[in-house]
Amino acid sequence: MYPNGLFGLDALRVLISPIAIFGIIFFILYLRNDHIRAGRAVLLLLAIGVFALLGAKLFSLHVRGWEVYEPLSSELRGGLRYPGALLGMILVGPLLKRWILPDLPLPRFLDVLAITVCFCFALVRFSCFMNGCCTGPECDAIYCLSYEPGSQVWYVQLQQGLLDHSSHPSNPVFPLHILFMAASLGVGVFLMWFDTKRSFNGQIGLLFLILHDGAKAILESFRVPYVGELQLTSLSISAAGLVALIIVLYYRRVNSA
């Protein structure tokens, strides 16, 4: 899916290990005052990462109608979708935490995991920038990017008959992946700041669902080719987070009255 990229690198496979290491270090340092067991935290995050990748791959296959890339090795180069990764973490993460790191309260775990995910996905978006995926419509402004043959945007334009020859690079496209990156980074910075002002453990996790997936849902409107299931899933997750936050705030207000 991403054979060449902007600098001739398969950036996803190059960056996945450094991103994982960054996420583990960030998570442990963020909770250093909670005196968590670092070894168990590493094991927990690695296990969650496996299920996140599995969820991202399954969601990608679902969106593609369960069609596998040819050759099969191309599946290792990409074909991952964020909503599947998030759903995998939400469904399996609490259970894994209970088994591996039971001393850390679940709501606090979800708060810090949410902040960690923001920064990790901002780094993942750099691989999108390198490889030419998650782009917007064609444009001719100075900030628009053209990608080498073999990139996702090149494949799409070739299939649509927009390129004169298969040896030509893609037509310039809007760098939507940079906005995705900025959204993840911005939400992460805000959540770190708000974490010091939170009213209860778990609030940051709910705000993450609302803000991060809400922003992603808006940006999905400009993706080319547009994938409705990606936008609908992000909207649903954001709405579910908003409903959950309203319910929690209501019950907290009732109980404090």
Labelled PLM ranges:
Residues M1-A257:
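Hydrophobic, membrane-interfacing alpha helices
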